[in-house]
C-alpha cells in the first residue's frame, strides 16, 4: 500500500516512516514512540522557504511553530534550514536558547506571558515579542528598561471579524481574549523606553 512518498506500508503490513519499519522501531525502543522523518521535515522546510524566496524576493521569514513539537532536535533542524521559530512559552523559548537558535529569528507569542518569561526573552534578545495587551506592554517596558534593551515588538490586533465558524475556535472577534482591540490602541500612548 502506498500512502505517500515518505510514508508507506510494507509487505508485512507495517507502517514505514522514512524507510524505517515502525513495528521494528517499537520492538527496539518500546512504545509510545515518536518517530520523525528528518528528510521529510527538511524537505518541507525547503518547500516553504523556497516559496517565500520566490514570491517575496527573500523579504520574509518562514516560522516553525514550536508548539507543534518542541525539542532540541526540531529547533536545531529548522535553524539549519534557515527558518525562524515561533515560541509561546518560557519552556519553548528555553529550548530554543539551549539549541543555540539565533535569537533575532525568534518570535515570542502568547496571550499570558509571565514576568519571568518576558525577562527571559528580553535578557536573551529575542527578535520580536508579540504584545497581546497593554499590561504586557507595560511589563515589557519595565523589563527592557532594566536591561537597557530597545525591544522589537508587534501587536496582536483583534480585527473585530466574525468568522462564522465554531465558537470554540473564533479568535478574531472584538471580545476575544487574544490581542488588543482597536478601541484600545487608538488611545494608546506608547511608553518611552529608556
Where are these regions (language model features)?
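Single conserved hydrophobic/aromatic residue that forms the stacking wall/gate
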Residues: 187-194
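Phosphate/diphosphate-binding glycine-rich loops and adjacent basic-rich segments that engage nucleotide
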Residues: 152-153, 157-180
Amino acid at each position: 500500500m502506498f500512502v505517500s512518498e515518505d510514508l508507506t506500508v510494507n509487505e508485512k503490513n507495517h507502517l514505514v516512516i522514512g524507510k524505517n519499519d515502525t513495528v521494528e522501531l517499537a520492538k527496539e525502543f518500546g512504545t509510545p514512540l515518536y518517530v520523525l522523518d528528518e528528510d521529510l521535515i527538511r524537505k518541507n522546510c525547503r518547500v516553504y522557504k523556497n516559496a517565500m524566496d520566490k514570491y517575496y524576493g527573500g523579504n520574509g521569514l518562514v516560522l516553525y511553530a514550536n508548539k507543534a513539537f518542541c525539542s532540541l532536535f526540531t529547533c536545531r533542524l529548522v535553524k539549519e534550514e534557515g527558518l525562524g521559530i515561533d515560541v509561546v512559552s518560557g519552556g519553548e523559548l528555553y529550548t530554543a536558547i539551549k539549541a543555540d537558535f539565533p535569537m533575532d529569528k525568534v518570535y515570542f507569542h502568547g496571550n499570558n506571558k509571565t514576568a519571568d518569561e518576558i525577562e527571559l526573552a528580553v535578557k536573551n534578545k529575542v527578535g520580536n515579542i508579540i504584545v497581546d495587551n497593554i499590561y504586557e506592554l507595560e511589563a515589557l517596558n519595565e523589563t527592557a528598561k532594566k536591561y537597557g534593551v530597545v525591544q522589537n515588538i508587534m501587536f496582536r490586533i483583534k480585527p473585530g471579524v466574525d468568522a462564522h465558524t465554531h465558537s470554540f475556535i473564533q479568535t478574531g472577534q472584538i471580545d476575544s481574549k487574544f490581542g488588543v482591540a482597536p478601541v484600545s490602541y487608538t488611545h494608546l500612548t506608547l511608553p518611552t523606553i529608556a
